[in-house]
Swiss-Prot record:
Site (described: Transition state stabilizer): K31, K256
NCBIfam families linked to this entry: argB
Pathway the protein contributes to: Amino-acid biosynthesis; L-arginine biosynthesis; N(2)-acetyl-L-ornithine from L-glutamate: step 2/4
Subcellular location: Cytoplasm
Keyword hit for Nucleotide-binding: yes
Catalytic activity: N-acetyl-L-glutamate + ATP = N-acetyl-L-glutamyl 5-phosphate + ADP
Record: residues binding substrate: G66, G67, R88, N196
Protein name as catalogued: Acetylglutamate kinase
């Protein structure tokens, strides 16, 4: 290492130190998905980030998605993927595939990545220890669904659920040890039926119940932008609501923002929308002065 490289390394460590001191002992819930789960270099940089967080005393809790992987396996099985209002119609056969992909393939791949990069992780679904109590999601028809449907009609999209409750005992047990919890967003109801739940919603609810310091949502965009295309680096919940009302925030970003807003309004200190396509995005957001995405706080 030459003198310039050594100087740069020292500068980076010094910049990170106050953040490490500030966040040591706190919990950070990370929704892991998008390109960060598909590119090998990004997968390994994410794993190294969470291992380092654990090493310096920050407790990461990971909730992951897996929509593209589910769609890929369904296609290989000759089963068409259907969506209503952005949600996958999940019949019993599709639910079996969801559980295989999320609870098996994707979850264990993340666990293996973390362990390969020097950490310890345990993979869970919401069915383990009844971690995620679910109820069936009820959708009302919209004009976009079908002209034949009345606006008040209920659409059955099968085993798609929403979070009714989170039992944190198993997360607390793992997070308080050397292990990093890796959670697949599959819930279970009182009758033992399984439900596919949006990973952003699960991450938000887990963050709320754990009273997490941060909720981090990895996305395929660099953050929230204003109407001129400039990144909005710091926003209050009041400002976010005004940006929704004036149409600056719209479309596919609305559910993520809704999840972040609800988390911050219910006890999470800050929520972050960051670009998962950037190597080491998580560490850059929480341990540097500038960060790399949009931070949302209550005031």
């Amino acid at each position: 290492m030459d003198a310039n490289s050594a100087h740069d390394t020292a500068r980076i460590l010094i910049e990170a130190l106050p953040y490490i001191q500030r966040f040591a002992g706190t919990t950070v819930v990370i929704k892991y998905g998008g390109n960060a789960m598909e590119n090998e270099e990004l997968k390994n940089s994410f794993a190294r980030d969470v291992v380092m967080m654990k090493q310096v005393g920050i407790h990461p809790v990971i909730v992951h998605g897996g929509g593209p992987q589910i769609g890929e396996l369904l296609e290989r099985l000759g089963k068409e993927s259907k969506f209503v209002q952005g949600m996958r119609v999940t019949d019993r056969e599709t639910m079996d595939v969801v559980q295989m992909v999320l609870g098996g393939l994707v979850n264990k791949d993340i666990v293996n990545l973390i362990q390969h990069n020097g950490g310890q992780a345990i993979g869970l679904t919401g069915k383990d220890g009844r971690l995620i109590k679910a109820r069936k999601m009820v959708l009302k028809a919209s004009d976009a669904d079908s002209p034949a449907l009345q606006a008040s009609e209920i659409i059955d999209i099968g085993h798609v659920g929403e979070v009714q409750g989170i039992d944190t005992r198993i997360i607390d047990l793992l997070a308080g040890s050397d292990f990093i919890p890796v959670i697949a967003p599959i819930g279970v109801d009182d009758n033992g039926a399984s439900y596919n739940i949006n990973a952003d919603l699960v991450a938000g609810k887990v963050a709320e119940v754990l009273r997490a310091e941060k909720l981090i949502l990895l996305t395929n965009v660099p953050g929230l932008k204003d109407k001129q295309g400039q990144i909005l680096t710091g926003l209050t919940t009041e400002r976010v609501n005004s940006l929704i009302k004036d149409g600056t925030i719209y479309g596919g970003m609305l559910p993520k923002i809704g999840c972040a807003l609800e988390a911050v309004q219910n006890g999470v200190h800050t929520a972050h929308i960051i670009d998962g396509r950037v190597s080491h995005a998580v560490l850059l957001e929480i341990l540097t002065d500038k960060g790399i995405g949009t931070l949302i706080s209550k005031d």
